[in-house]
């Protein structure tokens, strides 16, 4: 059991190092900042926003949403089963 845990932590470490090296490279490259002057206008809406999956924070946020959604489903499933069993045993 411990060697499986070791391999799991090792693989997460390798993935983390790859992600951190990708983000470090992006800091050294030059880029231009595009300012959107229409951000506060009425024409700006959520339809014009394009999410990016290239950053670690975006991937982390998506992963957190998926985990929260699955946990909510499991909790609601548990509540339904408990209520069903309590109704059966009355």
UniProtKB/Swiss-Prot annotation:
<keyword id="KW-1040">Host Golgi apparatus</keyword>
<keyword id="KW-0946">Virion</keyword>
<keyword id="KW-0732">Signal</keyword>
<keyword id="KW-0472">Membrane</keyword>
<keyword id="KW-1133">Transmembrane helix</keyword>
<comment type="function">
    <text>Envelope glycoprotein necessary for proper maturation of gM and modulation of its membrane fusion activity. Also plays a critical role in virion morphogenesis.</text>
</comment>
<dbReference type="GO" id="GO:0055036">
    <property type="term" value="C:virion membrane"/>
</dbReference>
<keyword id="KW-1015">Disulfide bond</keyword>
<feature type="signal peptide">
    <location>
        <begin position="1"/>
        <end position="21"/>
    </location>
</feature>
<comment type="subunit">
    <text>Interacts (via N-terminus) with gM (via N-terminus). The gM-gN heterodimer forms the gCII complex.</text>
</comment>
<dbReference type="InterPro" id="IPR005211">
    <property type="entry name" value="Herpes_glycoprotein_N_domain"/>
</dbReference>
<protein>
    <recommendedName>
        <fullName>Envelope glycoprotein N</fullName>
    </recommendedName>
</protein>
<feature type="topological domain" description="Virion surface">
    <location>
        <begin position="22"/>
        <end position="55"/>
    </location>
</feature>
<dbReference type="Pfam" id="PF03554">
    <property type="entry name" value="Herpes_UL73"/>
</dbReference>
<keyword id="KW-1043">Host membrane</keyword>
<feature type="transmembrane region" description="Helical">
    <location>
        <begin position="56"/>
        <end position="76"/>
    </location>
</feature>
<keyword id="KW-0261">Viral envelope protein</keyword>
<dbReference type="GO" id="GO:0016020">
    <property type="term" value="C:membrane"/>
</dbReference>
<keyword id="KW-0812">Transmembrane</keyword>
<comment type="similarity">
    <text>Belongs to the herpesviridae glycoprotein N family.</text>
</comment>
<feature type="topological domain" description="Intravirion">
    <location>
        <begin position="77"/>
        <end position="90"/>
    </location>
</feature>
<dbReference type="GO" id="GO:0044177">
    <property type="term" value="C:host cell Golgi apparatus"/>
</dbReference>
<dbReference type="GO" id="GO:0033644">
    <property type="term" value="C:host cell membrane"/>
</dbReference>
<dbReference type="GO" id="GO:0019031">
    <property type="term" value="C:viral envelope"/>
</dbReference>
<dbReference type="InterPro" id="IPR034707">
    <property type="entry name" value="HSV_GN"/>
</dbReference>
């Amino acid at each position: 059991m411990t060697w499986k845990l070791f391999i799991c932590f090792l693989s997460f470490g390798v993935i983390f190092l790859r992600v951190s090296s990708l983000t470090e490279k992006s800091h050294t490259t030059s880029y231009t900042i595009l300012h959107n002057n229409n951000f506060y206008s009425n024409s700006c809406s959520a339809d014009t926003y394009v999410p990016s999956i290239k950053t670690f924070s975006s991937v982390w946020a998506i992963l957190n949403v998926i985990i929260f959604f699955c946990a909510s489903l499991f909790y609601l499933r548990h509540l339904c089963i408990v209520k069903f069993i309590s109704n059966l045993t009355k």
